[in-house]
UniProtKB/Swiss-Prot annotation:
Protein name: Uncharacterized gene 41 protein
Pfam families reported in the protein's UniProt record: Herpes_heli_pri (PF05774)
Lineage, broadest ranks: Viruses, Duplodnaviria, Heunggongvirae, Peploviricota, Herviviricetes
InterPro entries: Helicase-primas_cplx_Herpesvir
């Protein structure tokens, strides 16, 4: 982790996140096109000194975006370096030219092919926890027990069809 006067740079695990100290009210979170971009947007919110938002506030802001994109396959895809366990391979061969992307599902990471739909068992809790892992690296932020109770309800909201 490196910090400067106006930004925060985090590398987790092989991905560089750069949070800039800009007011999040100047951009629309619903214009974010991927989960990784949403984590970047969340860092910007946390670093905004005018708004002074907590991690819980940030996740509540991102929940709209997550709910809107819950059936958008491309939104939830992550590169392999985010996986913590061996992925399941798809039934059809994946593209050998482009990097393979994955979903977090309740059965573990799932390799995705563009001809497949979004799996019904996406593990939204895993995405939220991975975002929290990045957010909690911001200096002077704390996470309390009540937040983890809220996460469970947010996961249930995202699972609504």
């Amino acid at each position: 982790m490196m910090t400067s006067e106006a930004s925060l740079f985090l590398q987790t695990p092989q991905h560089l996140f750069c949070g800039f100290e800009t007011c999040h009210l100047t951009s629309d979170p619903l214009q974010t096109h991927s989960w990784l971009e949403s984590v970047q947007f969340g860092l910007n919110i946390l670093l905004c000194t005018k708004c002074n938002q907590s991690i819980c506030d940030v996740l509540e802001t991102l929940l709209q975006l997550y709910f809107k994109n819950r059936h958008n396959a491309k939104f939830w895809l992550v590169p392999q370096h985010f996986l913590t366990s061996k992925p399941q391979k798809p039934n059809i061969p994946s593209d050998c030219v482009a990097p393979t992307l994955f979903f977090f599902t309740t059965d573990g990471p799932l390799c995705w092919h563009q001809k497949l739909n979004v799996p019904l068992n996406i593990n939204y809790e895993e995405y939220i926890h991975k975002a929290i892992t990045v957010f909690e690296k911001v200096p002077s932020l704390t996470i309390n027990k009540d937040m983890y109770i809220k996460i469970e309800s947010w996961k249930n909201i995202l699972c609504l069809l």
